Amino acid sequence: MKHFEANFDGLVGPTHNYAGLSFGNVASQSNAAQVSNPKDAAKQGLKKAKALADMGMVQGMLAPQERPDIHTLRRVGFTGSDADVLSQAAKASPVLLQACASASSMWTANAATVSPSADSDDGKLHFTPANLVDKLHRSIEPVTTGNILKAIFTDERYFAHHQHLPEHPHFGDEGAANHTRLCHDYGQAGVEVFVYGRSVADLSRPAPVKYPARQTLEASQAVARLHQLSDDRTVYMQQNPDVIDQGVFHNDVIAVGNQNVLFYHEQAFLETQAKLAEIDKKMHGNMYFIEVPTAKVSVQDAVKSYLFNTQIITLSDGNMAIIAPTDCQENPAVHAYLNELVTLNTPIKAVHYFDVKQSMQNGGGPACLRLRVAMNETELAAVNPQVMMNDALFARLNQWVDKHYRDRLSTQDLADPQLLMESRTALDELTQIMKLGSVYQFQR
């Protein structure tokens, strides 16, 4: 039976804007109040996803969330018609309206943690949506995320869906952005690496000072239990709090793994050598640990270029390639390092650059835009086929974007009732294109 890693990319929503909501995310905050281009953002994402499908990768798309989120605004006391709710929120709390209008669900690396059937004790593919409690604008996502995942991975013979963890900082969970699965072959049992920023129970552990540590050890352990992962299939690593304070808000900004490759910055982790030894032992050797020294790429350059927020993919010939943002090309130190990397004795033999600037300016690179799902051909056959990228879906979604999306959006536009109507009309049509059923609040 064939096994592979599929990527499910987040389709950028119609309200993509730059509100600077993500404290600790340097790009998000530094581009606050700029005018965005939702149409370009969506097309950049589609182009990247289609390119991977054309390289022979299994590629799907995840639908965006309903925004502005009128349901949440009503929960906090705004009343009347939908237009009244938007108007009241804009006057009383512009920041709250911005949070409820964020298109942040595009970064599906935060949508959920996924464990393949080869790793779990019950032989099922497990999904747990991330609760994202650290950021208001993202904490309103997990219920709809769960609905969308269930509409795509529906067959209970193969797929197990869990509720997101309790909505409390004790269980702060940021999903796959702090999780990477290592294996020798996608169909073999692997080792799942959970990276956390702090421990709630063990206050003797170091923690960042300037920016929040969004992922707790306790959340990572809970997800591993839900997914029925044994101790010899898991490794827990603490992210270096110093790099969190330098803008590394998720581990996928400072490290990325694929199969038997872990690509990471010298400063990424605490107790690095001991933890790499644990990984090597549980993987039974034959690992490539590619450490990028600070002398070649500073943490600042890594964050600015998103060198590690890249995708490492395995091509049909067995070689690996890096999918990088064009920002890596534009940074001299990073570009020089990547040119050197493909000549070294590692499986990584090529780098492909993509323009995802609309996402980058909000603090999300190629890796943020995708959720990885390792699966076999039987499981893939049970996936909703209408979300899988091919020539027809690419053309259909581009037409859909052209029909429904604006080419400029400012934070002032978020209170426009017409934007809400445009967004709902678009999403209603999208659920028909993708055969998702009624996954949104407004459809019920």
UniProtKB/Swiss-Prot annotation:
Chain sites annotated for binding substrate: 19-28, 110, 137-138, 214, 252, 362
Subunit structure: Homodimer.
Stored PANTHER family: N-SUCCINYLARGININE DIHYDROLASE
Organism, as annotated: Shewanella amazonensis (strain ATCC BAA-1098 / SB2B)
GO biological process: arginine catabolic process to glutamate; arginine catabolic process to succinate
EC number assigned by the record: 3.5.3.23
Protein name: N-succinylarginine dihydrolase
Family the entry assigns: Belongs to the succinylarginine dihydrolase family.
Record keywords: Arginine metabolism, Hydrolase
Family annotation (InterPro entries): AstB_sf, SuccinylArg_d-Hdrlase_AstB
Reaction(s) catalysed (UniProt annotation): N(2)-succinyl-L-arginine + 2 H2O + 2 H(+) = N(2)-succinyl-L-ornithine + 2 NH4(+) + CO2
Active-site residues from the entry: E174, H250, C368
Pfam family, one: AstB
Domain of life: Bacteria
Gene Ontology MF annotations: N-succinylarginine dihydrolase activity
Pathway(s): Amino-acid degradation; L-arginine degradation via AST pathway; L-glutamate and succinate from L-arginine: step 2/5
Keyword Transcription in record: no
Function of the protein: Catalyzes the hydrolysis of N(2)-succinylarginine into N(2)-succinylornithine, ammonia and CO(2).
Gene3D superfamilies: Succinylarginine dihydrolase (3.75.10.20)
